[in-house]
């Protein structure tokens, strides 16, 4: 009888320890994803936020005069789409840092709030990525319909940094999508 009770207690200990490992593994994966989202969005904001380039460009006033060489500066805050991009990534990075701290609290009542805020970050990042990408494509190709010339042939470094920051932010937004999917899956499994 004692051996039977001992075996059932050992089995319960095994189940409990396995459950703790699974919870810890899930918590660790959430923590890693949140830290990754923080690193990606903060790097995207910094790379884009320090982006500027000055080039000397010839301007032809009339065909009879020689060209006038003028220094022209490209900065991220000259375009509202780029301002939106930097601010959105700064917000997402701040939220990722706060959510890492909130995940240590471990309150189950916070899970729906964090899920909602994760969804908000996904929407914010994807919209800012779209805005920055649209302006980036204009810079690379121009728009012949409205006579906008391409500028990336002049400001190559600036355009390359824009492209790099958009890629980083896009990966960061995919990490937030993974967080939303994992959290929703976890909530669904707990409701069964």
From Swiss-Prot:
Highest taxon, organism lineage: Eukaryota
Gene Ontology CC terms, in alphabetical order: plasma membrane
Chloroplast in keyword set: no
Record keywords, A-Z: Cell membrane, Glycoprotein, Membrane, Transmembrane, Transmembrane helix
InterPro entries for this protein: CASP/CASPL, CASP_dom, CASPL
Disulfide bonds: none
Region Disordered, residue ranges: 1-22
Major location (coarse): membrane
Cellular localization per UniProt: Cell membrane
One Pfam family this sequence matches: CASP_dom
Glycosylation site positions: 52
Keyword match Transmembrane helix: yes
Regions crossing the membrane: 30-50, 82-102, 119-139, 162-182
Topological domains annotated Extracellular: 51-81, 140-161
Membrane-topology descriptor: Multi-pass membrane protein
Cytoplasmic-side positions: 1-29, 103-118, 183-192
Similarity comment text for this entry: Belongs to the Casparian strip membrane proteins (CASP) family.
Subunit architecture: Homodimer and heterodimers.
The name this protein goes by in its record: CASP-like protein 1E1
Protein species of origin: Ricinus communis (Castor bean)
């Amino acid at each position: 009888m004692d051996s039977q009770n001992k075996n059932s207690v050992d089995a319960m200990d095994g189940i409990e320890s396995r459950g703790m490992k699974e919870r810890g593994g899930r918590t660790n994966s959430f923590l890693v994803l949140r830290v990754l989202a923080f690193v990606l969005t903060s790097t995207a904001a910094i790379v884009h936020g320090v982006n500027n380039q000055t080039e000397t460009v010839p301007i032809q006033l009339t065909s009879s005069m020689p060209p006038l060489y003028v220094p022209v500066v490209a900065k991220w805050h000259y375009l509202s789409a780029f301002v939106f991009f930097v601010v959105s990534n700064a917000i997402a990075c701040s939220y990722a840092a706060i959510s890492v701290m909130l995940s240590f609290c471990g309150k189950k009542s916070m899970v729906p709030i964090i899920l909602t805020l994760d969804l908000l970050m996904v929407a914010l990042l994807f919209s800012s990525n779209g805005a920055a990408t649209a302006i980036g494509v204009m810079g690379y190709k121009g728009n012949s319909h409205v006579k906008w010339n391409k500028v990336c042939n002049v400001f190559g470094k600036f355009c390359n940094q824009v492209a790099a920051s958009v890629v980083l932010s896009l990966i960061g937004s995919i990490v937030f999508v993974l967080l939303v999917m994992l959290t929703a899956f976890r909530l669904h499994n707990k409701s069964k």
